[in-house]
Amino acid sequence: MGRRYFGTDGIRGKVGDAPITPDFVLRLGYAAGKVLASAPGRAASGARPTVLIGKDTRVSGYMLEAALEAGFSAAGVDVMLAGPMPTPGVAYLTRALRLSAGVVISASHNPYHDNGIKFFSADGNKLPDEIEAEIEAWLDKPLDCAASDGLGKARRLDDAAGRYIEFCKSTFPAAFDLRGMKLVVDCAHGAAYQVAPHVFHELGADVIPIGVAPNGFNINDGVGATAPDALMRAVRANHADLGIALDGDADRLLVVDHTGRLYNGDELLYVLVKDRIATNGQVEGAVGTLMTNFAVEVALKEAGVQFVRAAVGDRYVLEQLREHGWQLGAEGSGHILSLDRHSTGDGIVSALLVLAALKRSGKTLAQMLEGVTLFPQKLINVRMKPGADWKGSDAIRRAIDSAEQALSGSGRVLIRASGTEPVLRVMVEARQATDANRHAEAIADAVKQATA
């Protein structure tokens, strides 16, 4: 049976609408607490589980934090409160402090009126599907509050931000520093606002912070990785060397160079792979997604690096990295994984990896990406009748085959059905925009005629 509440990145929705309500989140805390308490070895040891709760800067975070805390306490689980903390910071602290689990209250790049809950295991990884299924099963059981002497306790984690700042700095090579560099750091009015500027400043950079005045309602609003225009303007206005854009929970990274040019996760993955090749001699493989630009795949293969596409979502990139035993993966949106540095995507750590690559090479981002020009993409969303059998259409198949034959080795076709509405997404990449447009429109026309 499929999961009812957990998606690819925890539980998420509009605050006040099910399931992001205080009563549900209290029960979620209780259910998660009971699963943790019954983990193998936990009951036998008699040790009380302890979880860490971090959050971003949404006004609803206070309400949901209190509800989670109450649920965990009712299940007999102790709670440590980190306050505003990037998602990767919660993952790191959970592992470093040897806690039972970590919980993040955040809806990442979404607007302030959304929020969500995601869990990390004791080793700093997102919970396996089977554990999330156990938690959902407990949600159907009565809430049986622990006796007074068995209730969980709650306390603030002293210097949570400072601990995470030191971890981030430790991932930057000791042989380098950032003295002489002017950086604009955009924290999206989100979870990294008390952390990211300090990391880069303490490593020697002249830091110009933006997006560091959260009021509970302005997270991701015209700032951050989902709205990089503000950063691009700030970099040019301040004559900065580089701009760093994080999202609301700081697990994404986009970078802007001194000219104001924006670099996405696909391009940054290529930069990091090239840096590893220069320092280690070779990189066996890297992981992208179905949406990774074809130019990056071509460039990596030309560099002798295997490339695998995962389903869209950093969870699936991580699965492929583990399956192949590789270290580097990314999504175009800015989720970058470097498993020799962290167990999850970390915008700050990823920025430090990019900065280290620039320091080692003595090149700019544009120079490191010389010869790699992203292919133009044409995306057309075609609305269909609900339940239309587009896969069984010979006309659609012929249109796809025709495009793939014409683009062989110089582009690709991706057809994806929306998971939430009767829409077929037709995406074509080609070296020339005219070719991408022509083939995408031909396929879209075939879809419209076959599914009308």
Curated annotation (Swiss-Prot):
Pfam families: PGM_PMM_I, PGM_PMM_II, PGM_PMM_III, PGM_PMM_IV. Binds 1 Mg(2+) ion per subunit. InterPro entries: A-D-PHexomutase_a/b/a-I, A-D-PHexomutase_a/b/a-I/II/III, A-D-PHexomutase_a/b/a-II, A-D-PHexomutase_a/b/a-III, A-D-PHexomutase_C, A-D-PHexomutase_C_sf, A-D-PHexomutase_CS, Alpha-D-phosphohexomutase_SF. GO terms for cellular component: cytosol. One of its GO terms (biological process) is carbohydrate metabolic process. The active site is at S108 (phosphoserine intermediate). Its cofactor is Mg(2+). The modification Phosphoserine is found at S108. The keyword Cytoplasm does not apply. Keywords: Isomerase, Magnesium, Metal-binding, Phosphoprotein. The keyword Isomerase applies. Mg(2+) binds at S108, D247, D249, D251. It catalyses: alpha-D-glucosamine 1-phosphate = D-glucosamine 6-phosphate. Belongs to the phosphohexose mutase family. This is Phosphoglucosamine mutase.
